[in-house]
Amino acid sequence: IQTIRFGDRITVQLQPLPEPYRELAVPRFILQPLFENAYNHGVEKMENGLIQLRFKMQPEFLNIYVENNGSCPDAELEKLTQYLNSTDRKAECTALKNVKLRMQMQGGDLQVSHGTLGGFGVSLRLPLHPAHSLNTEQQNGQPQKEETNHADTVACG
């Protein structure tokens, strides 16, 4: 849909996920809001917009980066960082806050920063062994089955 809307004005570069990580259970819809924000708040008005998805593997985590080459004023970045780190349950729940909360439920995190492309960047830190799947001890004499129905939304307040 975004390709039809923006045509050739915006390029999206997607790094393929390395094979060993393709079976990793992740919370649903964690990338869609990041791409929507990159389009709508980062590169929407640009003639040569660029959105990039890339991965960095670590022994215990998979880091996922969504970045754009739009503007990223320091004041806006600081305000967003404070909002994302706020524990105020009365605060408005945006897509980024929702993704951050869902990542934290899995033992991961979401951080915002200046991206390597010069614009806004979001990094997701996803544990290779989520907290809920680490406890495979038996309960009532039965082995625990790994959770596969990941939440789509989280109540923020």
Language model region names:
Residues A75-L77, S133-Q138:
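Short, charged, solvent-exposed linker or helix-capping segments at domain edges/interfaces
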Residues F120-H129:
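Short C-terminal beta-strand
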